[in-house]
Amino acid sequence: MSEPLLSVRNLETYYGPITAIRGVSFDVTEGQIVTILGANGAGKTTVLKSVCGAMEAQKGTISFAGRSVTGREPDWVARQGIAHVPEGREIFPFMTVKGNLMMGAYSRHDRGGIERDLDIVYGYFPVLRERQSSQAGYLSGGQQQMLAIGRALMARPKLMLLDEPSLGLSPILVKEIFGIIRRLNQEQKVTMLLVEQNANMALKTAHYGYVLEVGRIVLEGACEKLVENEDVREFYLGVKETAVRGKKRWKRTKRWR
């Protein structure tokens, strides 16, 4: 078996005295979309911030493409080929749309390649071409999410970290965004680590998944298997098994507890 593109082992990260994630281990295979599911506060964002260097992990190791990135600065990690699309998008509101996209290519020096990639981004997100001279702060929420993904794509990443791309978007826009995520994976060969509360959409999009609860991984498997798991169906997909006359007679707890 080939070495995973990203390998995280026994990761622990703290917020002061509070343990945010504890003993987290997982792999991301090159070419795949891997998702981490979990409720709000489970530690999903902390995992991504630890991987990209935005937060320092107190314990554990992070390896990317066979090289340790544990404890390195975010700009160094980004230059290795990891691009982060943060929760809440975090675009530069007073810069133009094109200016935001060019910020994604700040570490690149191949002008011709940058222009080609800009055309690729505009191909996936035509509205960004139409609004390229507008201030990014005037874009809608969905357009800002497209801009955040496009900005990450401009870095020509090997691995893209996506933090809650469905946050605050309408169901129609969520479907559009996740369709583009699948296309980027298939057509541009971008490996992705996706954290998402919308378990239904995440499991439809990803190849492999992990369930994170209270800072620890409690379940993993291929997504087509996870959607059949009784706990995942009830507690993350909202599908309940019913008893006689369509009513459940007891409140079941999760089997992994």
Model-derived features: where do they sit?
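Glycine-rich phosphate-binding loops of nucleotide-dependent enzymes
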Residues: 2-257
